[in-house]
Amino acid sequence: MSSNVEKETYSFYDTYTVDSDIDIKLPRTKIQFKKLDNGFAYFREDSEQNTIEKSIPSMKSIQVTIAPVLPINLPAKKTNGLIFLRLDKQILVTPESNVEISIKVPIEIGIFIKSELSADMLDVITCEPMHSRFGLYGVPDGGNLCMYSKVSQIYDKYPEPYVWAKMRITIKNELKQGVKIGKFVFPITAHKVYYKQKSTEVHIDDLTARVYSDISGENMELMKTVFETAGEDWQVSDAGTDSSASFVMDKGFD
């Protein structure tokens, strides 16, 4: 689907036909396309006054897609696809029980130039600079480098648009005692990103977290669960690149 660009806000997730100057309005981010004689100029300034400029040769118009993508590109791809989500409040799970929660998950925004054959990423943006951080799970000399974000549970409405997506987590405690859970580490690149066109709703594939005990102690295995779209009009914008869909947290999860 595409829509002609007029004097509206051009920031809903969608594909736009651009044939003149436009502004794209995202939180803490300024984006402009300028029509030139031989194509288009692209300009972006973020909340920290970092700027980028690019040129797009074209005769008359371009197709611009705005879509959420996995939070793995900024500040650089150095984590082997792992993400470390630290809960602002620990969750207590009683013995031998299951609970389901919904949490915020950070996203980035991709700006794509679409053609009949492909959709090429022109730029990728984070509307919250605090998401562009690294964290270490485990010990300094042998731990896992991860993208890091502090997150909270979602109780009713969708979280801040363009900054967060929604994810459901089913926690299964197989132990005979209660456990406190304060963090989740898993390969985000195994997940897909889903969004609704002309909207700001975003969902990421869900998780199942299994707490169990073996000879090494208490562990938590996190496994991807495919988001059930229930026939709704969800689009897939980022299908991930990693076939590994699970991770065992054997260095603590409280």
Feature annotation, model-predicted:
Residues 1-254:
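Interface-prone segments of viral and bacterial extracellular assemblies
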